[in-house]
């Protein structure tokens, strides 16, 4: 046997594993039976850290001076996930500020007077949806935004981040996401996007930022979500994608972004949401596995027969949920055909209202444990991993991922999770639910959709929707 | 280091005679902005002057110099970068000088989208002349951070747009010798093997690559990267994969060793789902690993899932799901058979 050479990847990995193990050992030593009882979300501390950021940031934040709508989104969305509110004054200030970031020709820049950029447009629109007031939604110039999005379209089928900017899967997602949520999608906008994203799925199964690059959690979320929104998700190799993403959850409980990279709390959302999205794609997954969905009733009948009944014995003791893992033929699962195509403009709504016919394929409790014990910082905020400092980005995506994990066992949108599926004391830890395609709190999504539906679709766009007058 | 002149003794713009004609434009943050940043004096002033020339669309030498100062203060400001490109083009500046500027900024900002995008723009303008420099530059980045995502994207773009493929496979080889777990290097290897115009493509390279990968797997069977790479070598051609004796032999070697079996089992399961007819040796290797609680008559695929449920508890739900999928696949083929028999009888 050749002895294994210790490389940088292994060394770095061992350091992180040791740190995480120390943390888990400590918690299990002080409360061996129910360590999770000791854990809670430091709501007040997080709220303090977040609202402080909204009010004042130090000079070191100058490097984020072109990402201020992101700072808005990270803080506002985190606060919404905690179920907290910042009050009317600060809300109005936020609307006013974001309006100053809106370009006269549509889209939002990184700050007042900066060029419009797709990522900051996404952040601004999601911030305004999270604020949720009619004034917030009506401050978005949908007509101009549509022309901005169209201007960013590239010959490759993808989108450009800004005039003269880079083309990648992030740009596709952010463009499609805002177009969908604001009901300004049309065929011209989505033309070629599917081809571009498809060309970014790698031999590993995940999705890369550009064709040829390495499969990566952030881009995999963006690519998958965009494909669902344009109703072309059946073109991706989903079994391959599933096999890649489930292997990204590491011994620490959290997710890594790429194969053989280190765990990082922000992938709790990027990778966790990928698994969560897949739970609603079971019909397409079955189709791709060569399983015909209309066979479901037969298999349900047959499953009581001899050859299959040895199944249960090794399921016992593994998980109380596993019997539910394969509810082919359960009510609702086959009500619609996988190839059935909803109106493109409403794919986000149709998707969230599908019954979840597939149980989560990752360890949601262990993920929650990582976020709460390793990423959470006592004085407020979340971090990548032990040894790192907190920041608003990781706070937003650790909380978003935590929410995804908490709701991953629910059967349908709007139903609360069972206490056994939430790590830590239920009432203290339970977060608000997000719409997994847009990463905004679900209730705010519904409000925004109601508003956008009230506005006319693309041509001609109405600038004065009725909803804003109520 | 002459590049420090700006930061060392910065003279405010308002005291610079050549800027006397410019009226700075303050940021329109409104009366009560959210996420307000407590800018330093230098930062605010520089940006106020930048806004002035940006709004006036002044494509001048002093504008170019100003964008340089603004970028040093915040390399993430894409508006400044974009305007700098406009000015560079208008002035017809020697772009090799510009490359030096980017090199200076790049030092501490290897994960900044804007710098890499600017480099790509520059390299595109410089054409074939830029190849050596860009390949060397990314090499330098990888010596510090061998998995830098932006640097890999840049390198791939250079190869595809401008060439320079000659030594790329050897370079991947070297990086993998340094760190066989470097998945970015495996990904680059796949990129070269599938896209290099010099190598003849995936099918032509397959045998050599399988040899190499199988060796890497034998050396560290718990390393996920070569397993995924091996699968990738047979993308869209599972028929050949199923027939490759090297693959069957490495599977047997790993399954009968003391190493982690997870990836070997996962791979075997994949093959079986693609109609591999398993050898007796492979079957017995799986039997040895099968938990005693399993019925010996269980289908091989289901045995593998059961082993994995124990050996890989993190993914117990995944393996359980895979098992349930196998169950249905089995049922469907039984049904198909039954139907076929029926129609024969009729
Ligand atoms: Zn992170």
Swiss-Prot record, chain B:
InterPro entries: Prenyl_trans_a. It is an enzyme of class 2 (transferase). It catalyses: L-cysteinyl-[protein] + (2E,6E)-farnesyl diphosphate = S-(2E,6E)-farnesyl-L-cysteinyl-[protein] + diphosphate; geranylgeranyl diphosphate + L-cysteinyl-[protein] = S-geranylgeranyl-L-cysteinyl-[protein] + diphosphate. One of its GO terms (molecular function) is CAAX-protein geranylgeranyltransferase activity. Pfam families: PPTA. Its EC number is 2.5.1.58, 2.5.1.59. PFTA repeats lie at residues 59-93, 94-128, 130-164, 165-198, 205-239. Keywords: Magnesium, Prenyltransferase, Repeat, Transferase. Disulfide bonds: none annotated. Its cofactor is Mg(2+). GO terms for biological process: peptide pheromone maturation; protein farnesylation; protein geranylgeranylation. It comes from the Eukaryota. GO terms for cellular component: CAAX-protein geranylgeranyltransferase complex; cytoplasm; protein farnesyltransferase complex. Belongs to the protein prenyltransferase subunit alpha family. Essential subunit of both the farnesyltransferase and the geranylgeranyltransferase complex. Contributes to the transfer of a farnesyl or geranylgeranyl moiety from farnesyl or geranylgeranyl diphosphate to a cysteine at the fourth position from the C-terminus of several proteins having the C-terminal sequence Cys-aliphatic-aliphatic-X. Heterodimer of an alpha and a beta subunit. This is Protein farnesyltransferase/geranylgeranyltransferase type-1 subunit alpha. It comes from Solanum lycopersicum (Tomato). The lineage of its organism: Eukaryota, Viridiplantae, Streptophyta, Embryophyta, Tracheophyta.
């Amino acid at each position: 046997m050749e002895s294994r050479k210790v490389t940088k990847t292994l060394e770095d990995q061992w350091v992180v594993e040791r740190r995480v193990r120390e943390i888990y050992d400590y918690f299990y030593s002080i409360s061996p039976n129910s360590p999770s009882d000791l854990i809670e979300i430091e709501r007040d501390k997080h709220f303090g850290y977040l609202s402080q950021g909204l009010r004042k940031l130090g000079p070191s934040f100058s490097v984020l001076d072109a990402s201020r709508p992101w700072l808005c989104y990270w803080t506002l969305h985190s606060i919404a996930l905690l179920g907290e509110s910042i009050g009317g004054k600060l809300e109005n200030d936020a609307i006013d500020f974001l309006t100053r970031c809106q370009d006269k020709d549509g889209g939002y820049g990184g700050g007042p007077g900066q060029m419009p950029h797709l990522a900051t447009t996404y952040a601004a629109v999601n911030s305004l949806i999270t604020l949720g007031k009619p004034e917030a939604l009506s401050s978005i110039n949908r007509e101009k935004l549509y022309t901005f999005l169209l201007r960013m379209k590239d010959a490759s089928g993808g989108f450009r981040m800004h005039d003269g900017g880079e083309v990648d899967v992030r740009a596709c997602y952010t463009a499609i996401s805002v177009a969908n949520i604001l009901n300004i999608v049309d065929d011209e906008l989505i033309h070629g996007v599917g081809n571009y994203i498809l060309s970014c799925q790698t031999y590993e199964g995940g999705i890369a930022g550009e064709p040829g690059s390495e499969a990566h959690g952030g881009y995999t979320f963006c690519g998958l979500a965009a494909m669902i929104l344009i109703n072309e998700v059946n073109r991706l190799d989903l079994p391959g994608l599933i096999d890649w993403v489930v292997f990204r959850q590491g011994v620490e409980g959290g997710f890594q972004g790429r194969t053989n990279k280190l765990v990082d709390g922000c992938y709790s959302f990027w990778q966790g949401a990928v698994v969560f999205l897949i739970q609603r794609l079971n019909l397409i997954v079955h189709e791709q596995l060569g399983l015909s969905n209309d066979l479901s009733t037969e298999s349900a009948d047959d499953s009581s027969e001899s050859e299959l009944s040895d199944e249960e014995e090794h399921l016992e003791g593994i998980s109380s949920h596993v019997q539910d893992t394969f509810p082919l033929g359960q009510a609702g699962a086959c009500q619609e055909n996988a190839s059935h195509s909803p109106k493109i403009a409403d794919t986000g709504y149709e998707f969230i209202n599908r019954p979840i016919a597939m149980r989560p394929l990752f360890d949601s409790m262990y993920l929650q444990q990582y976020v709460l014990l390793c990423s959470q910082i006592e004085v407020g905020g979340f971090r990548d991993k032990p040894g790192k400092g907190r920041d608003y980005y990781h706070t937003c995506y650790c909380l978003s991922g935590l929410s995804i994990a908490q709701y991953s066992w629910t059967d349908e949108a709007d139903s609360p999770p069972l206490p056994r599926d939430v790590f830590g004391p239920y009432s203290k830890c339970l977060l608000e639910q997000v719409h997994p395609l847009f990463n905004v709190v679900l209730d705010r999504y519904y409000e925004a959709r109601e508003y956008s539906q009230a506005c006319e679709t693309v041509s001609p766009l109405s600038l004065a929707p009725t909803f804003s007058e109520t | 280091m002459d590049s420090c002149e700006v930061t060392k003794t910065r003279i405010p713009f308002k005291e610079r005679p050549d800027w006397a004609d410019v009226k700075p434009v303050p940021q329109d943050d409104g009366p009560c902005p959210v996420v307000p940043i407590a800018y330093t004096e230098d930062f605010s002033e520089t940006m106020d002057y930048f806004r002035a020339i940006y709004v006036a669309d002044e494509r001048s030498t002093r504008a170019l110099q100003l964008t340089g100062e603004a970028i040093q203060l915040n390399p993430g400001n894409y508006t400044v970068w974009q305007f700098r490109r406009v000015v560079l083009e208008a002035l017809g500046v020697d772009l090799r000088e510009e490359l030096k500027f980017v090199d200076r900024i790049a030092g501490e900002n290897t994960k900044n989208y804007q710098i890499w995008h600017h480099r790509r723009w520059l390299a595109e303008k410089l054409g074939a002349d830029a190849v050596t420099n860009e390949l060397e530059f990314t090499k330098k980045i990888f010596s510090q951070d061998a998995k830098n995502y932006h640097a890999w994207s840049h390198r791939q773009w250079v190869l595809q747009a401008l060439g320079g493929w000659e030594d790329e496979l050897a370079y991947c080889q070297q990086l993998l010798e340094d760190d066989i777990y470097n998945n970015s290097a495996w990904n680059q290897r796949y990129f070269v093997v599938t896209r290099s115009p010099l190598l003849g493509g995936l099918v032509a390279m397959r045998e050599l690559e399988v040899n190499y990968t199988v060796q890497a797997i034998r050396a560290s069977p718990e390393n996920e990267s070569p397993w995924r790479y091996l699968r990738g070598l047979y993308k869209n051609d599972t028929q050949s994969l199923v027939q490759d004796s090297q693959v069957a032999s490495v599977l047997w070697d790993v399954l009968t060793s003391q190493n982690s079996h997870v990836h070997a089992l996962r791979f075997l399961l994949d093959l079986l789902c693609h109609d591999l007819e398993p050898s007796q040796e492979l079957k017995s290797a799986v039997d040895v690993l099968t938990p005693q609680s399993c019925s010996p008559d269980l289908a091989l695929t289901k045995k593998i899932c059961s082993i994995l449920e124990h050996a890989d508890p993190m993914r117990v739900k995944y393996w359980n799901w895979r098992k349930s999928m196998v169950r249905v696949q089995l049922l469907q083929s039984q049904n198909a058979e039954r139907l076929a028999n029926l129609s024969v009888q009729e």
